[in-house]
Amino acid sequence: MESVIKKNIIVNAVSLKNGGARTILLQFFNQLILKQNDFRDFDFYLFICDGVELDARDIPISLQIVHLPVNNIVERVNWEVFGLRKWIKEKDLNVSLFVSLQSIGFFFNDKNQLIYYHNPIPVYPKRWNIWKKNETKLWIYKTIFKKIMKWSYNDNSVFIAQVKWVEQALKDTFYINSDQIHIIKPDISSFQNRIHFLNDNGAHQSDPNYIYFPATEYPYKNHLFIVNILSRLLQTAPNEEPLLSTWKIIFTLDINTSGIYQIIKQRGLEKYFLFTGHVSYNEAMKYYQKSKLILFPSYIETFGLPLIEAAFFGKKILASDLSFVSEVLPDYEGLQMIPLTDEDAWVKALLANINHTTSFDSYLPNYETGWDDFFGLIKRYS
C-alpha cells in the first residue's frame, strides 16, 4: 500500500500565556484533539512558551508540542524572524501551511499563512506616549511592532478577526483585501459546562453590594474613568453617599503596584473600592456570582469575553456604546450601552442601578461561526 504523504502545519503560539490570548490557545488545542480523526493526513507542530501547560489524556502522535524559552518581546521577535526558519531547516520540513494564533505572521514570502488576529493596539487609531509609564508598551506595539507585523504579512496571508471593527482596521492599517479576512467568533460552548456556577450563586447576606470590573490596568480599559464617575456622583448627589457606602467597586488590580489605587487614595475614595489582585478563573466566576452590576467601559477590545461571562450569569451590564459590544451581545436585555465619554450619562446610569438592581435570565449568544470554520480554512489553504 502506498504511504500517504502528510501535510505539515506549523502553529506559532509562543506569546499566548495569559488572559484571552491563552484562551485562544486552549480552545485551538482542545478543538484539534477533538478533530484529530479529521486530520489524519496532517502533522501539526505547535510552538508554545515554557511554563504553559496543555492538558489532554490522549495527545495524538500527529501533534508535536515544542516548548520554547520566549519570555519577552526581544526573544519573541528573534524566534519569529530567525529561530523558526532555523528550526524548519534543521528538521528538513516541507511546510504546507503556517498558522499564527498571535496576530503576527511569518517571514516566508511565498508560503500560505493563516493568522488569528487579536491584538487591537497596532490597528486602533490612537497615539500613545512613550514617556508615560503606563503607555510605553502600547507605544512599542503601535509603532515598532506594527512595522514588524506588516513585514511578516504577504499576499498569501489569510486573517481571522473576531469582530467587524478589527476586520475594517486590518483593511485600513495593512491594506488587506476583504477576501483575505474572515470573521470567526471564539468558542463559548464551554459555558454550558459551568452550569453548576449558576446553581450556587455564591452570595451571602453579609456580602457588600458588589460592582465588578474584571480588567488589567491598561489605559484603554478605563479604570480612571470609573474613578472619575464615582467622584462626580459624590459631588453631584452627596445625599446618595450613605447608599454608595454600602457598595464596593471591584478592580482586579494589585493594590501595591496600581497607579489607579494611588489616585483613589489621593481622592479619599478607598472605602468604595476593593482591589483583589490577579484572580483565578474560579475566583472570577465567584465575583460574577456575587456582583449585582458589571462595568465594561473599555474602548479597545478584539472581542470582550467578560461581556459573555456577565450575561451568562444574568447580570446587568453597563458598557461603552461601541460596535463590538452589541456584536458580542446582540440581544441581551441586561445590556445598557452608554456613550463612551459622557460622564453625566454614566453617573445617571450608575445611580439608577444602585438604587434598583435587576437580574436577568442566563444568556449565551448563538454565533454563526466558530472553530469548525477555522479548521476548515486550515484544510482549504494547506
Descriptions of predicted regions:
Residues 316-319:
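Short hydrophobic beta-strand element within catalytic cores of glycosyltransferases
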Residues 299:
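Aromatic "clamp/platform" in nucleotide-sugar-dependent glycosyltransferases that forms part
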Residues 19-30, 218-235:
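A conserved mid-protein helix/loop that constitutes part of the nucleotide-sugar donor-binding site
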Residues 46-51, 214, 242-261, 277:
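Glycosyltransferase donor-sugar binding loop
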